[in-house]
């Protein structure tokens, strides 16, 4: 029979549990609060009764000092008359302070120590009682010294008289005052816990804060008076101007209606609360527009009256230079306002263009851009910046119908035009884009807006990206999204390898499209999709099976678009040199039909960076603010970018035209980018393509890719020269499994490369040939 363990011998038997301790403490706290409430209910009436008895005290009432049967006038009755008489005879006028002192001390004692942690810092009840008694003694003594009267009850009472007489006999009047004052301060500290030094410090801070406050008030008053004088002066000028305008002929200024960005169906769906969380009707790969910040209400630009005044001022400024013009229209936008002027006969456009800086100085604005030709009109445009510039949010562009109705998966939301309408562009029609501008002009923000535009339009099955970021700051935030072909490239040697892989991929796609009989990537994907829907998928015409592995032809898969982002093209040109320029030129010349597109950005728009070879193959360009007309001509082949305002203000040169369009780029915050990136990371795992950044690159059939992107030979990449051969050999000998899928999974490489590694091991005698069931035996001993 098992021996029963006594309660004392059990571990922690004598220790209360945490739950029990909490229960006991909570019970005690509840009892303490209940007791405090009861004491407060009892003390409050007593103090009120005592105060009322003191205020209604009468000498004629019978009490301690006077007996009789007269009528009691005290509101507290006989007891109140007795108590008031005793207190006045004993303490004098200090009797009025006694209920107040008792009330203050009681309140501090009851409500000053709710938390147990503060219990040790509060005074004990005995000390509080000593403080109250000391307060009565000190107060009665002070009252007796300074309010001495023949009637004892009118001064400090009997107590004050006895205290002062005793102290004066030994210390005199001066010493008695000091002693009584010291006793008063100590008593107040004991009774209430008040720190006199802390009180003096607070008073000092208040006193020191008074002079700055007075100075600030005086300064505000002066500013208000100055503003009032300015308002009165403006009123006088306005009256004079109104009289002058009344004498002139009225001018017509055509103001277009305020553009309204119509929301797309996708934007309306994203604003609705889904029935099931995590469900996206357009596919879980596309992020929701709710991840972006909503546009905020902003102050508009010029008012109608200001536009009329500016129109008159423009005409007067041109008259100063002996040029007659007439303002016939004004078109306010979110950032600038375009005034359309009609010059007089015989006035050349070059005369007006040469006066852009003089007009800007005369109008007191930062810059003025002259639009020499406006299609469809015989007027000249004069673009003047608004006083209040509106911020354009990317969410407003992506919610527009212009962006949503664009059928292309490569739709870029660039910003808004001068009229406030969304401007979108199709990268597939460009087919490549060159972005240039000085530091701080908004170039990097625009690149981020382009990236997000693509991410909100196409999933990782339809679009893959290769990002090259020499500065390691702008594009590295997109690390880990499923759209990337490889990790964000920061090493320029790896950048050259990535571009070389893209050239080889372009050549491979052209071979596929030629074998299938289509002219572009859209036709190829359509033909593959139609074949799959018909139940007869197309086989890969470039597939070369290995007879030893018993491989079968693979069906063709849909090919995604590839967009290559290079954030700082000039740095890469300086490090790598001509080799990169040749690779980019090859991609720019031929990659359009293969679905590979380039977006190049640089902050150094010089001729040694933006070479003639690159400009000839990239006709679509965006120029942000630059420092000189020479830089503007380097980018756009014409001036104008030097007059931009910065912060996203750009000139967009569409493909097939020589007339740049002014666009105000959208702002993208870092928080928005991080939210979208986190959503994409959670929606799908990273799917890097093997070998994109390798120094030795091979195609699926084992052909080595040369420095120019062309295949060189068919002898490399499948034997011991593979850089991953030693690692694969170690995995096989350690795990004792010669499985292609195991090597593929452990090394994160493609199936064909893993199969070539296993085949190389078979040639070297590490593994046996495949048996009838496909298994291989590991012949080499395990590593020691």
From Swiss-Prot:
Residues 199-784 are cytoplasmic. InterPro entries: AAA+_ATPase, FtsK/SpoIIIE/SftA, FtsK_4TM, FtsK_alpha, FtsK_dom, Ftsk_gamma, P-loop_NTPase, WH-like_DNA-bd_sf. It is found in: Cell inner membrane. Residues 420-633 form the FtsK domain. Gene3D superfamilies: 3.30.980.40, P-loop containing nucleotide triphosphate hydrolases, Winged helix-like DNA-binding domain superfamily/Winged helix DNA-binding domain. GO terms for biological process: cell division; chromosome segregation. One of its GO terms (molecular function) is ATP binding. Keywords: ATP-binding, Cell cycle, Cell division, Cell inner membrane, Cell membrane, Chromosome partition, DNA-binding, Membrane, Nucleotide-binding, Transmembrane, Transmembrane helix. Consists of an N-terminal domain, which is sufficient for the localization to the septal ring and is required for cell division, followed by a linker domain, and a C-terminal domain, which forms the translocation motor involved in chromosome segregation. The C-terminal domain can be further subdivided into alpha, beta and gamma subdomains. The alpha and beta subdomains multimerise to produce a hexameric ring, contain the nucleotide binding motif and form the DNA pump. This is DNA translocase FtsK. It comes from Xylella fastidiosa (strain Temecula1 / ATCC 700964).
